[in-house]
Design a protein with these regions (language model features):
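A generic, well-ordered mixed alpha/beta core segment in the N-terminal half of proteins
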Residues: 81, 91, 99-122, 144-145, ...
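Cofactor-binding active-site loop characterized by glycine-rich and histidine/acidic residues
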Residues: 47-50, 54-212, 223-241, 519, ...
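Conserved acidic/glycine
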Residues: 1-73, 78-80, 283-438, 448, ...
Length: 727
């Protein structure tokens, strides 16, 4: 017999016989009415788990990682307000069923079963995935098994007090809300969880408000690996700035009492707390997990003896709230409800086409207040003496600084965050004076942890802010890429566009820094960004474009709720000259306030029959090469694609109309570089002869060989000449 059926039959038999596991007497402030509501949610969650397994075995359901053994989370839901944002562990079905009962109009059994069956009418994901979550219940969807939702929970909690001082237009959380995030004991060991909890402690230690409740659901095992006894308590009980609470998660009275105290502490003190619940795991990790292959039978039989529903039944009967017959009636009623609803659910349509699946990758547009831009008085106050320099040509670094200033003046919901972004003004000085102009609330110096930086941004976006996080160097993004790839980029997809986290992520990157940094400060690979569905990647090549593209990126985030990555070529920050020393050929005046470059709009210079398609540093070098090639009788047109993703195919094809040959110049590596996508597109949609010049598949060296592996003016000239002379 399946373990789920064994536990089910044991529950019915033991309640009927009055044979309950031992435990403490019921105590605390939990009312009988609330206790019954919690138990009903527990029973519903349990029977949803059982039904999901039956659906899966019949080919009608597609998810069997259940919440059985973790039903104590229903008591945690009761201890919180329904408007407290909750980032849930994947075993928190009971939390959702309990909160659902607190929100009028929700139908937990129907909704969860629709999710199990991946029905198009699933109210959260639209049939794309089985995820816990609900817009009405303030539960953003989570699918993570590695605690990657903890960093954004920290960010969301941080946003609450920030929103009091700087109310964003699209504010979500109330001023006295708290944020809850839950995770398993195994996930607590993951670097992402460790980093997020450390960030919460670091923040709280400095008396910065952070109303966040961590809930660790400790069932002593992660798939097959046991958690050392006492490990969670020893690890988290004495963290600076973090209050530790411990409860028996099998006891709904104890769990409610302690969870209520923890929530009250967080809400009143505006400090983070860690609620440690002792639980059991029933049935194994998932339906396909045969726990008997790695656990002694006596171990999981002991867990089954401690079934939390049996503990709840004992407590409810001992306290006189319910009789044994009433306990069984609730359990059987929810079982029959799940069976009845499942028969209806399996008749629902499922997604079948790529268009249907992809429909929610790009989030919906939203209504935003119209603005007239910052006033001249505000600009004069903010810029000071800098405003006198705006009519003179400047390098990219200064122009980006001015663009950020104007944007922050116009949109008070913009918040910047990174290591050294504030008082220092950034490693390259791009954010100089911004902290003085807008204060430490809006230009935040963070601790050194890229996952926490991006998590802070995602969390702020959940509460209506427009975050502008910065990653100091492109190579450092790899430390935290899942925060974009697995979290930010998937939110609209998994919520059918109901939840969004718009942002503009600035990354200083690419190569060609003279004699500085080697690989870790010069990374010429954008592959990690290019294939993330829905993410926009921009890369300006000079200051004027940087300003105009940054304005468009901000608009895309604010109005279209997009996740945008803005890659700033480090080597071009200070670039002044193009061909000759002091020619000022790569400096530009500050663009007028109404100027921008639209998504997909490419830049074109020249109209020669040989087209060079490039971006970033490649554009700069191609301009140098074009001058020499012209002297040799080869006329060039240069197409700066500007937008790395999505590839601006229509703009590129229009720009090369009339050309005879095409050379793709890619400063990124030959393997995984942008040239691969360009070559594929041109092969599919154009008959022109095409060649490419890309960087070697190599890391970047420090010292005189800093550019040896990447395209140069000379190599572009040689490649263009060879292509042009090829019949």
């Amino acid at each position: 017999m399946d373990r789920a059926d064994i536990v089910h039959e044991a529950f019915l038999a033991r309640v009927s016989a009055g044979e309950f596991p031992s435990g403490d007497a019921p105590y605390g402030p939990l009312s009988g009415f609330e206790a019954v509501a919690i138990f009903r949610a527990q029973c519903l969650s349990r029977n949803l788990d059982r039904r999901s397994r039956k659906m899966q075995s019949a080919g009608q359901g597609f998810y069997t990682i259940g919440s059985s053994g973790h039903e104590g989370m229903a008591a945690v839901a009761s201890a919180l307000r329904r408007d407290d944002m909750a980032f849930l562990h994947y075993r928190d079905g009971a939390f959702q069923t309990r909160r659902s009962a607190m929100v009028p109009g929700t139908t937990p059994a129907w909704d969860m079963l629709l999710s199990f069956s991946t029905a198009k009418s699933d109210p959260l994901s639209g049939g794309r995935h089985k995820v816990l979550g609900s817009k009405a219940m303030n539960i953003p969807p989570q699918t993570s098994t590695i605690a990657s939702h903890l960093p954004k929970a920290v960010g969301a909690a941080y946003s609450i007090s920030l929103a009091k001082r700087h109310p964003p237009e699209h504010k979500v959380l109330k001023d006295d809300s708290i944020v809850m995030c839950s995770f398993g004991d195994a996930s607590a060991n993951h670097s992402t969880a460790q980093g997020a909890i450390n960030t919460a402690c670091w923040t709280s230690y400095q008396s910065v408000p952070l109303p966040l409740l961590f809930v660790c659901e400790d069932n002593d095992i992660g798939i097959s690996t046991r958690t050392p006894q006492g490990w969670i308590g020893a690890s988290f009980a004495n963290k600076p700035g973090l209050k530790y609470f411990k409860a028996n998660g099998l006891d709904l009275f104890d769990t409610f009492c302690v969870a209520q105290a923890a929530a009250e502490y967080v809400r009143k003190r505006k400090k983070p707390a860690f609620l440690h619940l002792s639980l059991v795991r029933l049935y194994g990790h998932a339906g396909a997990d045969l726990q008997q292959t790695y656990l002694a039978k006596s171990i999981f039989e002991e867990w089954e003896q401690n079934d939390p529903l049996l503990h709840s039944a004992r407590l409810l009967t001992e306290s006189g709230v319910l009789t044994a017959d009433e306990v069984l009636s609730i359990y059987i009623e929810t079982e029959e409800q799940c069976a009845r609803v499942a028969e209806e659910v399996i008749q629902q349509q499922r997604l079948s086409t790529s268009q249907e699946v992809m429909a929610s990758i790009v989030p919906p547009k939203r209504e935003c207040k119209l603005t007239n831009g910052p006033s001249e008085e505000a600009r004069e106050t903010a810029f000071g003496s800098d405003i006198q320099q705006m009519e003179k040509p400047q390098n990219m670094s200064r122009l980006i600084n001015w663009a950020l200033t104007d944007l922050m003046l116009e949109y008070p919901e913009i918040i910047m965050m990174s290591e050294d972004v504030g008082r220092k003004g950034g490693v390259y000085g791009v954010t100089q004076k911004l902290c003085d102009r807008f204060g430490q609330d809006r230009v935040i110096d963070t601790l050194l942890d890229e996952q926490s930086i991006l998590g802070l941004a995602i969390g702020l976006a959940h509460n209506g802010f427009i975050p502008l996080p910065e990653i100091q160097f492109l190579a450092y993004f790899h430390n935290a890429e899942d925060q974009i790839r697995g979290e930010a980029a998937t939110l609209s997809f998994f919520s059918n566009g109901q939840f969004t986290n718009p942002m503009v992520l600035r990354i200083a990157g690419l190569g060609y820094q003279k004699g500085f940094g080697g690989h870790f400060h010069n990374d010429n690979s954008l592959a990690v960004l290019r294939d993330i569905p829905g993410v926009i990647v921009a890369c300006p090549s000079h200051g004027a474009d940087a300003v105009k593209m940054l304005r468009e990126c901000l608009r895309l985030a604010r109005e279209e709720q997009r996740v945008v990555v803005f890659v700033e070529p480090i080597a071009l920050y200070p670039m002044r000259d193009l061909h000759d020393e002091k020619d000022g050929g790569w400096m530009h005046t500050y663009p007028a306030m109404d100027e921008s470059v639209s998504l997909g709009e490419v830049g074109v210079t020249g109209n020669g029959p040989l087209a060079i398609i490039t971006y970033g540093n490649g554009h700069y070098l191609s301009q140098q090469a074009a001058k020499v090639l012209k002297q040799q009788g080869i006329e060039i047109r240069i197409v700066d694609i500007r937008w790395i993703a999505p590839l601006p195919a229509e703009g590129i094809l229009s720009a090369i109309d009339g050309a005879q040959k095409v050379l793709v110049v890619d400063e990124c590596r030959g393997t995984g570089g942008q040239a691969e996508a360009l070559f594929a597109m041109l092969t599919e949609r154009s008959d022109l002869p095409v060649a490419r010049l890309a960087a070697e598949d190599s890391f970047i060296a420090t010292g005189p060989a800093y550019a040896a592996t990447m395209p140069s003016r000379e190599s572009i000239i040689a490649a263009a000449t060879k292509l042009w002379n090829t019949l």
